């Protein structure tokens, strides 16, 4: 029963943190430090729940883009989404083949949380002096693609934080537009990464000993929580900055570093 409870908690944690700029990977690793580690497949499945949540939130936007390619604005937006995704896929695969990734331990995660918090504050400070723009440029698309790779290499960075705030610094100063582009790019990116990782686990026969009840509970928890959090966040950022998330990251990072000493 305790294992089922921890699976539920980890699913909820994934749903809360996946699309907030606080690093879901970092929070899951911290939680697993006390609750016990889970299999790679478990972590893939709960991320899949979050992917379904964000897909459902943006279902109308996705459908509009898919059925409206006769419009230049839609074609341009889709091409930029595709560019960001392909950059992430190509560079990310090269990084994966090179086994280039920091160890998933508490100390580097703590530093990534702190640095990411400072990064958010800088981006907010710069963006508020820029005219409000919601047009995605090619430089933003390319930078977002590379930022996703950086987030994958450095646990604790946060895919949302690295992509949203780099986009804001490069001129996509309207928070909702930056967040929307980040989330839409995240759908194919996370789906592809999860599918690839799951296929690798399947080939190695590592799916035979999973507790499917725990996996299912965590999946549903991540999906429902992720949906609620994204809906809330999209409303919140219309009239608020991301600064509270920055302060939270910095505080959590400092607490973790203090705990390690």
From Swiss-Prot:
It is a multi-pass membrane protein. Signal peptide: none annotated. Disulfide bonds: none annotated. Keywords: Antibiotic resistance, Cell inner membrane, Cell membrane, Cell shape, Cell wall biogenesis/degradation, Hydrolase, Membrane, Peptidoglycan synthesis, Transmembrane, Transmembrane helix. The chain crosses the membrane at residues 38-58, 75-95, 106-126, 136-156, 181-201, 217-237, 241-261. Its EC number is 3.6.1.27. The keyword Methyltransferase does not apply. It is found in: Cell inner membrane. GO terms for molecular function: undecaprenyl-diphosphatase activity. Belongs to the UppP family. This is Undecaprenyl-diphosphatase. It comes from Xylella fastidiosa (strain Temecula1 / ATCC 700964).
